[in-house]
Regions:
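Cytosolic-side junction of a single-pass transmembrane alpha-helix
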Residues: 16-30
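Elongated extramembrane "stalk/tether" segments
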Residues: 29-139, 143-153
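General structural signal for secondary-structure boundaries
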Residues: 3-4, 72-75, 157-158
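Extracytoplasmic/periplasmic C-terminal soluble domains
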Residues: 142-185
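Feature marks short, highly hydrophobic, charge-poor N-terminal signal-anchor/signal peptide-like helices
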Residues: 1-14
Length: 185
């Protein structure tokens, strides 16, 4: 092969290597961006999906679906009503932990519904919620699971319901928080 042929081959090889490195870096940045955005939900989705590629596609799909939703903050009136409902649920816990935790679950679902999140089923709702509230969604699932679990002694059940109330409170506070406008400079 002539010198010119070797030079052309070297240039083509270099271009291919640079392209492969660029693609790899782009994928790495995309993965890192999803990991940063979704936090623990990223790891949970990878574990559940069985592969990083499948999980990342799922997370990107969630972002796309979320963009097409009309998620709105609560009105001041709705926020006040839900805050009163929440205070009642917390007071109820002393006398009836089971009913209080179920009421807390219902209140959080109501807030999600009023804000425009899908209410088809828990998986659809939590998938949409994970885009805007990736840390709260884990607590929402945990609280929901605690409320709907069975087979515990009365003491264990009360403790599970207490943990559910704590989880729901974190989620509730995040969901009812007024949207803050960015400060103007």
């Amino acid at each position: 092969m002539s010198t010119t042929g070797w030079v052309i081959l070297a240039i083509v090889a270099a271009v291919v290597v640079v392209a492969l490195v660029a693609m790899s870096m782009s994928r790495s940045r995309r993965s890192s961006g999803l990991r940063d955005r979704f936090g623990p939900e990223y790891d949970r989705t990878v574990t559940e999906a069985g592969s990083r590629r499948t999980a990342e596609k799922d997370l990107r799909d969630r972002e796309e679906q979320y963009e097409s939703m009309d998620i709105q903050p609560l009105s001041d009136g709705a926020r006040d009503r839900y805050t009163e409902d929440w205070a009642r649920a917390e007071r109820l816990f002393v006398d009836d932990p089971e009913l209080a935790a179920r009421e807390a679950d219902r209140i959080v679902r109501g807030v999600l519904d009023d804000r425009g999140y899908p209410n088809d089923d828990l998986d659809t709702q939590t998938a949409a919620m994970s885009v805007e509230h990736p840390n709260a969604v884990q607590r929402y699932r945990h609280g929901h699971d605690m409320v709907h679990s069975n087979g515990q002694s009365p003491e264990e059940r009360t403790e599970s319901l207490r943990k559910a109330m704590v989880d729901f409170r974190v989620v509730f506070e995040e969901l009812v928080e007024p949207v803050r406008e960015p400060a103007e400079h």
